[in-house]
Amino acid sequence: MSGKEILGKARTVLIIDWPSKDVPEALTLAGFQVFVKGGPGPMDYERYELDHGKPVSSHLGRPPDRADLVYSYRPVGELVEVISLAKTLHAHTIWIQSGVSISGEDDPKGCWLAEDQLGPARSMVLTSGLDFLSEPYIADVARELQRAA
């Protein structure tokens, strides 16, 4: 399934450990409910919402009740925990940040998982019963969906 198809079916996205605001803001502007797990504590969750057309975040202090999609920026060694959280939230898909842009070219925003780790990561996620995606950059897909709307 493509990134556009996956986002087209999702309404709620949990982002794990994203280091900047570009992804949650792009998803929020595209109409998604966005939550971010972003700190070392077990209850370090934020919610993104639109306030007068601008994305703003507020401390939630707990995981969301559910998420259709989990977008992770964590190393493969932590994937078991990411899968467990995704299943708890009834997510359908784990999308892991890759180094490929929506146009299919290398993306300077980075590749958290090296190419040799993507295969094992994909296997772990698929074996758990969830869908797996590693490209393209999710913010680019959200912006494209927003423009098409």
Where are these regions (language model features)?
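A short helix->loop->beta-strand "cap" motif at the edges of active sites that frequently abuts
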Residues: 32, 89-94, 127-130
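NAD(P)-binding Rossmann-fold cofactor-contacting core
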Residues: 24, 28-48
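Glycine-rich adenosine-cofactor-binding loop
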Residues: 8-28, 38
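ADP-ribose/adenylate-binding Rossmann-like module
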Residues: 87-119
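A short acidic, amphipathic alpha-helical/loop segment
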Residues: 23-26, 81-86, 120-121
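Flexible, Lys/Arg-rich cytosolic regulatory linkers and terminal tails that connect or flank
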Residues: 112-149
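Glycine-rich, highly charged phosphate/nucleotide-binding loops
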Residues: 47-65, 71-81
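Structural motif
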Residues: 68-69, 93
